[in-house]
Design a protein with these regions (language model features):
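Globin-like tetrapyrrole-binding proteins
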Residues: 133
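Amphipathic alpha-helical segments in structured regions that serve as interaction surfaces
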Residues: 91, 107-108, 125, 129
Length: 147
């Protein structure tokens, strides 16, 4: 995430952009589908505060988006050098700024083990399982909504 202030607006379609949505170019007459899906406020009027909402389309986006999938693969590659339990812990710290509880840790380890086994327990199957798990974490409301 680029935390610098100011500068030109960026296109939402620019996959290399790491700016906050405050810096997105917004066409008032035709709101981008991703912004509309995330219940973006009406662009033609002032909106000092947004109410948190979650829509079914948001969940489908996180499950089917090539962009989200690529971010999950990048995170998987970043965590690949550590043991499975530590991967789950680090994923929670990076995505949610907290440690997983015991149930979340066990669920993450169980999910990745079962997914890898279903894929033939090969190295590629294990890597795919971790990418799937991380993508699922990115679809949680806790990741999507800033508290």
């Amino acid at each position: 995430l680029d935390l610098s202030m100011g500068g030109p607006g960026q296109s939402i379609d620019d996959l290399k952009s790491y700016r906050r949505s405050l810096y997105l170019v917004v066409a008032r007459e035709e709101l981008h589908p991703v912004l509309r899906m995330h219940d973006f406020p009406e662009a033609s009027s002032h909106s000092p505060r947004r109410e948190p909402t979650t829509t079914p389309l948001q969940q489908l986006y996180f499950l089917n988006s090539a962009w989200i999938e690529s971010r999950a693969v990048q995170l998987r590659d970043r965590l690949e050098s550590v043991a499975a339990e530590q991967r789950v812990r680090q994923a929670y710290v990076l995505l949610f700024a907290r440690e997983p509880d015991a149930e979340e840790l066990a669920a993450g380890l169980e999910f990745t083990a079962k997914q890898a086994a279903a894929g033939g327990a090969t190295s590629d199957a294990e890597r795919a399982a971790w990418a799937d798990y991380l993508q699922a974490l990115m679809g949680l409301s806790e990741f999507v909504t800033l508290e």
